[in-house]
Amino acid sequence: MPITANTLYRDSFNFFKNQLLSTLTLAVLAALVTTLLGHLFIPDSEQMKLLTEAEFTFATSGKAGIQELVSQMTPEQQSMIMRAGIGTIFSSMIGSVLLVGGVLTLVAAVSAGNRISSLQAIGLSASQLPKLFLLLLICTLLIQFGLMLMLVPGIILSIALALSPVIMTAERRGVFASMKISWKLAFANIRLLVPAILLWLTARLLLVFIIDRLTFIHSEMAGIILGVFNNLISAILLIYLYRLYMLIASPQQKSI
């Protein structure tokens, strides 16, 4: 019997509905971790004042370009910029790793007939989190690089690497082995992956647009709300990808 996207969508949403509390807990936890870690790297009020003064001085000088801006900064200001940038990436990656590891472990356990909580899911995935962090970091850098070149390469890489976290979690594969298998399976089942990835990207863009219009919400609260809903959207995609992989992965494919 052929696999249809409608069947997978229905199955994924039913799972999401039945495990809503656990999934929501994981989404909130990941968003809070990202926010709290982000605050550790955000410059304090005095440092922000120095950065603002540097930006104002640069803007009034009539120059343009990020390289010129950085070159005009003091070493202390450059260090703050670098720290904030690295901190933002690191905190976002940690939140993503907790979400991906927790959701995929939850789906695997429930599919096997075991009842576990969201915290138990994170605990069970702990041994995989370092490898998962490396995998997500590499995939994110590749996809962002593709998006910077042109939009299409980034989308293609998003589709090609979409199954790699599922493969790593389900099959205990290494980073590059998971990416290799994902690449082959993704293009062999592209009709089932493209709509899901495009819906995911569209939903995230719409969410950013909506949250950005809610000006009455404090910026920090808006950031947390955006993070939670982004995580819920990603959780639905992860459930879909796990279900899809379980259907398309034959013993021959698993031995690749």
From Swiss-Prot:
Q: Which UniProt keywords apply?
A: Cell inner membrane, Cell membrane, Membrane, Transmembrane, Transmembrane helix
TM regions (residue ranges) = 23-43, 89-109, 132-152, 192-212, 221-241
Would I find Transmembrane helix among this entry's keywords? Answer: yes
Q: Where in the cell is it found?
A: Cell inner membrane
InterPro entries with a match to the protein in the record: UPF0259
Is Cell cycle among the key words of this record?
no
- Record membrane topology: Multi-pass membrane protein
GO CC terms: plasma membrane
What family is reported? Answer: Belongs to the UPF0259 family.
Q: What NCBIfam families is this protein classified in?
A: PRK02868.1
UniProt xrefs under HAMAP family: UPF0259
Protein name according to UniProt: UPF0259 membrane protein plu2479
Q: Which organism is it from?
A: Photorhabdus laumondii subsp. laumondii (strain DSM 15139 / CIP 105565 / TT01)
